[in-house]
Each structure stands twice: as C-alpha cells, then as structure tokens.
Amino acid sequence: MKAIRVGLLGLGTVGSGVVKIIQDHQDKLMHQVGCPVTIKKVLVKDLEKKREVDLPKEVLTTEVYDVIDDPDVDVVIEVIGGVEQTKQYLVDALRSKKHVVTANKDLMAVYGSELLAEAKENGCDIYFEASVAGGIPILRTLEEGLSSDRITKMMGIVNGTTNFILTKMIKEKSPYEEVLKEAQDLGFAEADPTSDVEGLDAARKMAILARLGFSMNVDLEDVKVKGISQITDEDISFSKRLGYTMKLIGIAQRDGSKIEVSVQPTLLPDHHPLSAVHNEFNAVYVYGEAVGETMFYGPGAGSMPTATSVVSDLVAVMKNMRLGVTGNSFVGPQYEKNMKSPSDIYAQQFLRIHVKDEVGSFSKITSVFSERGVSFEKILQLPIKGHDELAEIVIVTHHTSEADFSDILQNLNDLEVVQEVKSTYRVEGNGWS
C-alpha cells in the first residue's frame, strides 16, 4: 500500500519529537490510516550536527525548496517558526498541491485566514492544532466536537511562562523579577521574555481560538493586550485576601453579534477551575449554549506534547487523503467581524488606591462611582506602613462598562484626596461563566 511521504521543515525540539513519534508509532499510524508514513525530506541548518533522532543523510537538506518542490512529498510539516518568509513557503507548498501541518501560532494569528483560503483554493488541507496550547486538542474540539453548539465564551491560560511566574509569585510570595530570572534559568522563559510576559504570545493564540470559536476573521490587532510585568507583591496579596487568584487570562466573549477578545491579568475566584492550573500547564475553559461549561487541560508546550498534536494533524490529513476529501479541513467564517466598543464590554473591576487618610476622603471616592451608577461588591481600607498620612483602599466593583470605568479612573486621578491609583485588574468567573 502506497506510503504517505512527509517533508519536514525544521529538526529542532519539536521537529525531533515529530520524527520520533513517526518512527516509534508506525504500527499505530498504519492501523489508523491503513498505510505507512515515511519521512522523505527534512530541512536542517547544519548537515553535520549530531541529532537525537536517526535519519539517513540523503534525507537531510539545507535548502527549503528541496522539500517544497520534491514531487514525492505529499505533506509538508512546518516547525521552523517565523512569519513573512515562512508564509511564502507554505503558500508555495499549497500551490504545489501539498498538504500542510504547522505549529506556528505567530503565522496563523497574522495570516491564518489567508492560508486557509489558499488551501481551499488548491484543494489541500492545512491543520494547525499545535499552534495553540501545545498538547491540548482544543482547535479540533472547537471545529468538530463542539461544531453543533454556539460558543459564547472562552477563557484560557495559554502561556506557560506567565503561568509559571504567577504561580511562583503566589505560592512563594516572591517578587516578579526574581521569579522571571528563575524561569529563564529553568528554560521556561526566553532571554528576551517580552513576547511572553507582555501577553503577545497569548494574544496570538486567542486570535486563533476566537476565529474558530466564533467563526469570524479575528486578527491579532483585534486583541487587547496587557502583560504581567507590572504586577506587584501587594496586588497578589490583596487579591488573595479577597478570595481571588491572579492569572494571565485570554478572554473571548460573544454577546449577540458582537465579540471582544483580550489578554490581561485577571482575578478569578479561588474556587474557579482555572485557578487550580499551576506552573507551566495550560487550560482553556469553554462555554457553549448547549453543552454548558467545559474545560480542557494539559501541557502547553514541550517537544513531545507539541509533536503529538502535530502528528495528530498529520493523521487527519492522511485520513482525508485516503477518503479523497481534502481541501475542506476548515469551514470559512460564517459571520462578519463585529468587535465590541468599550461601552459594550462589561466586567467587574479590582482597583487599589492610595488616598489621604482624612475625614471625607472615602465619601469623595464613592461619589465618583455613584455618579456612574457603579456599586461595590467588596471593600478594604487599611493603613499604609510608614505613611501615617495615607490609607490604602481596595475595591471590587460590580459589573461596569470599560467606558464608564475609564471615566471613573480619570475622575479619581483628578481628586485632590487621591495620591495614586496603584493598579486595576479585571475580575472574572464569579458564577464561572
């Protein structure tokens, strides 16, 4: 029976994992799709480098188009990263009638819609399960398992680096900079951690999730982003005192025809399932009108978890090839994109304020909120050590719009009794959904 022949772009951590799974699981793959899988060509940087996997020398090449233009290659698997140049490689592969599997979240967040259209036009499949949450099969779940439902909300911990940092800050009461260095030493954070800690990595993944979950062409620029680098020990301490856990949460929510997508530090009730996701693990919480609340949990990165998702996509492509139904791996968007304005986005808010500790300060602050019709769910007022003339007020509001909350912050900063608004965070998950 004719083998399916794979061309692999990249033989790093994930690429080596892909080769290992294909080599070690031949019997399983044969049983799944009824034909063997062979690795025909592999792009590498250095032909002489010692590798963790055993491949014949004639399979290796340093020229990308040796893989893409090889007439014997049926499926191109891309694990080299990059955006602009890599996009062209995949477009050329699709135009050469080769199916594509990619783990590239950066590429799919920016050019996903274009690549899906290119695949359909050429009668080819493109799969990208590994681009979001590594070993968690969340994209296929949205596209297939929950395809009959209407998804109204997704909340995700989709960046392992920031979850590791926040877990350590909470459990060990360690400052941000100290935990970041530990994460770098352990290999969880890059030497330049900006993409992770400022929320950009998570934003790319949320754009992909929202695109599939809401069937709209959601782009990276549609995602509002705030990272974790400004979170302080005091923020962590006060949130715990009020019964919340700080997480970097990607939020995608639909109300009627409008959606919002954001990534930001968020306070969740301690009893919320996402609050129990620790260290480098990922999880995605999904709410559907029919299914209700579901959550998907697992490793968000790493060689073998990510490679497992890549090879699972390869199996999906192979099955489609055997059945003659390629070119329809993903359905196009059903709806026109319609993003919420700040006046449409409602949430509870947490804020810490340093104020003058004098008669009338609190009433002046509460009047700012009451003018906007915003009430309080929780309030703390405490002295500030070493500053007898000041007090700290911590407030959790009831639901208010982003537009009203922005005006409230401006009016608070204009008050003579307010020394500084120290921090603000969104609060989610009271009642879970």
Curated annotation (Swiss-Prot):
Naming one, the record's GO cellular component terms include: extracellular region
Which Gene3D superfamilies would you find in this protein's record? 3.30.70.260, Dihydrodipicolinate Reductase, domain 2 (3.30.360.10), NAD(P)-binding Rossmann-like Domain (3.40.50.720)
Question: What does UniProt report on the pH dependence of this protein?
Answer: Optimum pH is 9 for the reverse direction.
Among Pfam families, the record links this protein to: ACT, Homoserine_dh, NAD_binding_3
The ACT domain sits at: 350-426
Q: Does the keyword Metal-binding apply?
A: yes
Domain of life of the source: Bacteria
Q: How does activity depend on temperature?
A: Optimum temperature is 35 degrees Celsius.
Requisite cofactors: a metal cation
**Active-site residues?**
205 (proton donor)
User: Where, per UniProt, does this protein localize?
Assistant: Cytoplasm; Secreted
Q: Which residues bind Na(+)?
A: 129, 132, 134, 136
The free-text function statement in the UniProt record for this protein reads: Catalyzes the conversion of L-aspartate-beta-semialdehyde (L-Asa) to L-homoserine (L-Hse), the third step in the biosynthesis of threonine and methionine from aspartate. Utilizes NADPH but not NADH as coenzyme.
What family does this belong to? Belongs to the homoserine dehydrogenase family.
Name under which the protein is recorded: Homoserine dehydrogenase
